[in-house]
Amino acid sequence: MGSQKRLVQRVERKLEQTVGDAFARIFGGSIVPQEVEALLRREAADGIQSLQGNRLLAPNEYIITLGVHDFEKLGADPELKSTGFARDLADYIQEQGWQTYGDVVVRFEQSSNLHTGQFRARGTVNPDVETHPPVIDCARPQSNHAFGAEPGVAPMSDNSSYRGGQGQGRPDEYYDDRYARPQEDPRGGPDPQGGSDPRGGYPPETGGYPPQPGYPRPRHPDQGDYPEQIGYPDQGGYPEQRGYPEQRGYPDQRGYQDQGRGYPDQGQGGYPPPYEQRPPVSPGPAAGYGAPGYDQGYRQSGGYGPSPGGGQPGYGGYGEYGRGPARHEEGSYVPSGPPGPPEQRPAYPDQGGYDQGYQQGATTYGRQDYGGGADYTRYTESPRVPGYAPQGGGYAEPAGRDYDYGQSGAPDYGQPAPGGYSGYGQGGYGSAGTSVTLQLDDGSGRTYQLREGSNIIGRGQDAQFRLPDTGVSRRHLEIRWDGQVALLADLNSTNGTTVNNAPVQEWQLADGDVIRLGHSEIIVRMH
């Protein structure tokens, strides 16, 4: 009988809609508020769902679809207010003894398929609905995934008139399959700024900020998309700042050893030519960051001090992989003396960089008496000519050093690395953190990924993972996650919490644990 009754109601409603559309097409006319109220009440009655305990659940979100002309007149008609319709419909639902999960919300949207005087209404059960007070900010068409299962579900609104529990009803019964409606976005259309660039790239122009080296030229709001900038090279960007490469500041000071020249011998001053420009390298002191450009500046014996002939530059371990520290007995070790020509070496492996001044023995900081008088080599295992460290030390010395933290070979923090910084954060301490996902085992597919700190699970508005289950307290349990350990704690809930069918107050979660609260089950997944 119930199915026959619904069929008859459906046929009657279809006939009413057909007749009403025909009159609207022929005679036109405006929308009458009483007709809208009647349609909303009929939609609420048609959307009733039966729950356990002889309770009836009505939709709480209603979308009224109007033609374009009627939609534009909404702001001028004070009787066509979504808040007024929602208030009247909520009173009607309460009078009928029905329940809703969430506040009753009425929204308007437009459709180009409807003529003047035609309108449609549809109702859905949406626990995540939020009230939008402005009428003109009408609801945009619902997307197919608006209420789908997403990690970190936003707080749901709560209906204060909802009394009593829903029993064993599955939470996914609240989700209506009518969310997937045709999308008719009133704000759709081409991008108003999608036109061509009126400037046509970057012709010379006056006014505004002048084209500054190092910063993009000023753009008009209607200029168009970013690709028209033609990238940084054509802007003159950082390269034309005459940036860091040929600063010749620290290198041409000859570290701190040639302090007689000091800063006045910084060469061109300011920010020298770009990395791409490679001015000739003087055969004198090493250019460090400068003369040969970006790559050679790091692979020549630059840095804070010049590399004596044959000396090992930069992070010594990078330069000659596997070679032990140079000793002053060796012929290639020159403790002091005039700097030789820059030594051309391949890119990064022999980078001179910052370490040069700390590895050249007496050649660095020497003439300023920073290292000439004191024996800083006592921090390594071999006495050397005074200086900060024996040549070839540095971070990347791969074998047998007393500062490689007990490893006999190249540093290995999870994968082979040529030394020093390149192995950091890979393996060892774990390059990727563990994540914990809670999966609601009710067929809805809802999941929630734990955030670091407190994660509240319950039925209330302040819960990060809300469950539409009246057997669940508003603040039922808390899971604290610190990136390594997930600790569950029951928050004095009414019906309690079980993990793997065992009642718990506190519990350290593991992969595969099954949390039961109210009539809901949550499976813990650790990745």
UniProtKB/Swiss-Prot annotation:
Keywords: Cytoplasm, Phosphoprotein. Residues 170-188 have a biased composition (Basic and acidic residues). Pfam families: FHA, FhaA_N. Residues 199-209, 256-266, 284-299, 345-366 have a biased composition (Low complexity). Its main location: cytoplasm. It comes from the Bacteria. Residues 300-322 have a biased composition (Gly residues). Coiled coil: none annotated. Residues 271-283 have a biased composition (Pro residues). Residues 455-504 form the FHA domain. The keyword rRNA-binding does not apply. Residues 119-426 are annotated as: Disordered. The modification Phosphothreonine is found at residue 116. Regulates cell growth and peptidoglycan synthesis by binding to MviN. May inhibit the late stages of peptidoglycan synthesis. Interacts with (phosphorylated) MviN and (phosphorylated) PknB via the FHA domain. Binds to the PknB juxtamembrane domain with an affinity that is modulated by the degree and the pattern of phosphorylation of this juxtamembrane domain. The structure of the N-terminal domain remains unchanged upon phosphorylation. This is FHA domain-containing protein FhaA. It comes from Mycobacterium tuberculosis (strain ATCC 25618 / H37Rv). The lineage of its organism: Bacteria, Bacillati, Actinomycetota, Actinomycetes, Mycobacteriales. The gene is fhaA.
